[in-house]
UniProtKB/Swiss-Prot annotation:
It comes from the Bacteria. The lineage of its organism: Bacteria, Bacillati, Bacillota, Bacilli, Lactobacillales. It holds the Pfam family PRA-CH. This is Phosphoribosyl-AMP cyclohydrolase. Keywords: Amino-acid biosynthesis, Cytoplasm, Histidine biosynthesis, Hydrolase, Magnesium, Metal-binding, Zinc.
Length: 109
């Protein structure tokens, strides 16, 4: 594991987090973490986020039972975005869909 300094300052104290299924690579969701959510995620190996709409820490699965267990964490070249692969229990999306990315805008086929 490499010790990198994540840049929480660039985007107002939050990092975008792209979450993928660790087995398939499917993108499940995009959310945000503040430093507290990031530390809790590292410590517990379960996903914590910062809810921008509720302005509070959010432990994924506490309400729905659809927990996310961390399998790997990567950062981009600027250390201001995270890519986290998880074991997803149930649906990742609040709509009940496995992935939040199900609305197709363009597909040439």
């Amino acid at each position: 594991m490499t010790d990198l300094s994540l840049d929480f300052k660039k985007q107002g104290g939050l990092l975008p987090v792209i979450v993928t299924d660790f087995q398939t690579g499917q993108v499940l969701m995009l959310a945000y973490m503040n430093e507290e959510a990031y530390q809790k995620t590292l410590d517990s190996k379960e996903m914590y986020y910062w809810s921008r709409s509720r302005n509070e820490l959010w432990h994924k699965g506490d309400t729905s039972g659809h927990y996310q267990y961390v399998k790997s964490i990567k950062t981009d070249c600027d250390q201001d975005t995270l890519l986290i692969a998880v074991e997803q229990v149930g649906a990742a999306c609040h709509t009940g869909a496995y992935s939040c990315f199900f609305n197709e805008i363009y597909n040439p086929e």
